[in-house]
Regions:
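Generic structural marker for isolated residues within well-ordered, non-membrane alpha-helices
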Residues: 41, 57, 174
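M16 family metallopeptidases and their MPP-like homologs
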Residues: 20-32, 57-167, 183-192
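Generic recognition of flexible, low-complexity loop/linker segments
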Residues: 11-12, 73-75, 162, 174-178
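His/Glu-based metal-binding/catalytic segments typifying zinc-dependent metallopeptidases
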Residues: 1-53
Length: 196
């Protein structure tokens, strides 16, 4: 589908008697998996919240102990420039304001100060290891072959992406994050028993 910008909203949904609350946010990005800065955005997203060693996980769950789970994901457009960047947190309803503040603070810090060379190197290494391990799984291979047939692609593109990830610089990762992640454009949904 053609790119359509996310309408920024904040919606609260009451879920009576549920022990946990959930925050889900997201925004569309005018980017495909063929964009020159897609590899850099993969690295940037992983550092922000795409793994258990990410900043969000380390701070919101680890250091502050505010959530049971927290992170981000990147769903890349394969047919057109229409990707999605999302974030989530699972937490006790009474921690709503603290969780929102902590997530916002990590996003602001990443955008303002950027990432370090060490963070970028670690993220690249982890991404490449995960991609290599995934290709050793029969189910991943089968799914990739079906996807490649549909998209008219070959394994050569996967190799190209591996090489592009390996060559991402700290400047490129920071530039991609700042280009695509606009906190004011996020659509945010909060579900939980907040009335208690």
């Amino acid at each position: 589908d053609p790119f359509r910008a996310t309408q920024p909203v904040v919606r609260t949904i009451e879920t009576p008697d549920k022990a946990n609350a959930v925050l889900v946010g997201g925004m569309t990005l005018p980017m495909s998996d063929r964009a020159p800065d897609y590899p850099a955005m993969l690295v940037a997203e992983r550092i922000l919240g795409g793994a258990t060693e990410s900043r969000m996980f380390a701070v919101v769950r680890g250091k502050l102990g505010l959530s049971y789970g927290v992170g981000t994901w990147l769903d890349e457009g394969r047919l057109d420039d229409n990707s999605t960047l999302g974030l989530y947190a699972i937490y006790a309803p009474e921690n709503l304001d603290k969780v929102r503040a902590a997530v916002s603070a990590e996003i602001a810090l990443a955008l303002e100060k950027g990432y370090t060379g060490e963070e970028v190197d670690n993220a690249k290494r982890a991404l490449l290891e995960e991609r290599k391990s995934a290709r050793a799984e029969d189910s991943t291979l089968a799914g990739s072959l079906v996807s490649q047939a549909f998209l008219g692609r070959t394994w050569a593109l996967s190799g190209d992406l591996d090489r592009a990830i390996a060559s991402v610089t700290v400047e490129q990762a920071n530039a991609a994050l700042r280009k695509y992640l606009k906190p004011a454009d996020l659509a945010t949904f909060l579900a939980g028993d907040f009335a208690k």
